[in-house]
Amino acid sequence: MNIIDQVKQTLVEEIAASINKAGLADEIPDIKIEVPKDTKNGDYATNIAMVLTKIAKRNPREIAQAIVDNLDTEKAHVKQIDIAGPGFINFYLDNQYLTAIIPEAIEKGDQFGHVNESKGQNVLLEYVSANPTGDLHIGHARNAAVGDALANILTAAGYNVTREYYINDAGNQITNLARSIETRFFEALGDNSYSMPEDGYNGKDIIEIGKDLAEKHPEIKDYSEEARLKEFRKLGVEYEMAKLKNDLAEFNTHFDNWFSETSLYEKGEILEVLAKMKELGYTYEADGATWLRTTDFKDDKDRVLIKNDGTYTYFLPDIAYHFDKVKRGNDILIDLFGADHHGYINRLKASLETFGVDSNRLEIQIMQMVRLMENGKEVKMSKRTGNAITLREIMDEVGVDAARYFLTMRSPDSHFDFDMELAKEQSQDNPVYYAQYAHARICSILKQAKEQGIEVTAANDFTTITNEKAIELLKKVADFEPTIESAAEHRSAHRITNYIQDLASHFHKFYNAEKVLTDDIEKTKAHVAMIEAVRITLKNALAMVGVSAPESM
């Protein structure tokens, strides 16, 4: 249990003991401890006096006074209590208890903020899963940054997380890829008789693949059409996936599993789920097609599984894939989808219900659109005209750290304008620069301290830490683990970036208010240890969103 929760629990226990001592209630109702919006109203507050009004049959202010009169303030670290308004009890704490977070952070190091106990739940987090038909763009970048950060957060919160990329290497888009490569392949050999398919891929990468295959495998031209397209499907996916994996690795995004859609066909899992759904009575035939009764499970309409030409819809392999996730022993399934996949939520949840799987185990986050902005104007993207702004170009333009930080600053369900000019600025207006500069500034101070013979572990007395800005800074450090817990619970990576900004801000305010290195050696030791705790917290928080913590800038 973190230090904040310990203090809250102690307050609850002491309030309960006080209620008993005052004889206000035989059965004590739930005691809620809140943080007042205005810090002038104390560190914590409770409305328990008003809750007890009917039970105790007394005025709430009288009840509040009785609680205060019987409270053991020392155990709860309380230095002052006010009764406000109709009966709110405001607690002002002796903030020396906060200094216990300093040696804890230093001792735990990279693990500070992480929950020690396992949640005992397996989470399969699927993200990015871009079709292997071209370069990654800004939408994929947001998905990658948020997904990877969320995986880090859930891991820190005690979940067993598997990071998975679903390779869409079957279906019409791969046939179109193969046809597009075929056209470019023969063009490279001087044969322009093969026209680009209507839904083909016109990017420069396809031209490059065609040229490369023409140089390395000219014999493919002599294959039968069926064998040739099969080879282009296979080689095309290999080329595209190698490039995607390389870009994602450079973007500091890594996966435990690369799950192939084709494997679902090879292992017979699609036929298996189809047979099972038929057996359970959830399918029917209409208009020459096979349908799934998803309306039985709150979907707005039934969905086609097999079209009237005998081909599968995208939905059928998606069902097989999600059922496979369940069979692998995952308790929670989290999908991060693009903005164009909103209609998939109800149908996927309904498909799991057909197998008796609680659909609440599937959580789907929709990544809203990102607009790339430069000099106040939107930079347009068009994947199929060859003019797309790729992830690689974004990394080259603003850097991995800035890209990842900016893309995790907002809730994924909100539209976001990515200001590339701001992301490149080396000023405190740039959020990632502001955060990293705080870390670098601390490292500089610690280096000076070491030159003076002061180590971060030298302090054993923190009573000299009394400055208001220092206390606020320590409160923020102590709030790191609760923030991770909250971010994990709400699946919200942006809570961590918000926390980083607040922590950096509190540090800069402290730095501007009080010198760390002074002639008072004991105070200096305490401050050096404190800013080391801040540095560790800042570094760990930045790592959670995949951003580095430079020691100098």
Swiss-Prot record:
It catalyses: tRNA(Arg) + L-arginine + ATP = L-arginyl-tRNA(Arg) + AMP + diphosphate. Keywords: Aminoacyl-tRNA synthetase, ATP-binding, Cytoplasm, Ligase, Nucleotide-binding, Protein biosynthesis. Its EC number is 6.1.1.19. Disulfide bonds: none annotated. It is found in: Cytoplasm. GO terms for biological process: arginyl-tRNA aminoacylation. Transmembrane segments: none annotated. One of its GO terms (cellular component) is cytoplasm. CDD domains: ArgRS_core. A motif ('HIGH' region) lies at residues 130-140. InterPro entries: aa-tRNA-synth_I_CS, Arg-tRNA-ligase, Arg-tRNA-synth_N, Arg-tRNA-synth_N_sf, ArgRS_core, DALR_anticod-bd, Rossmann-like_a/b/a_fold, tRNAsynth_Ia_anticodon-bd. SMART domains: Arg_tRNA_synt_N (SM01016), DALR_1 (SM00836). Monomer. This is Arginine--tRNA ligase.
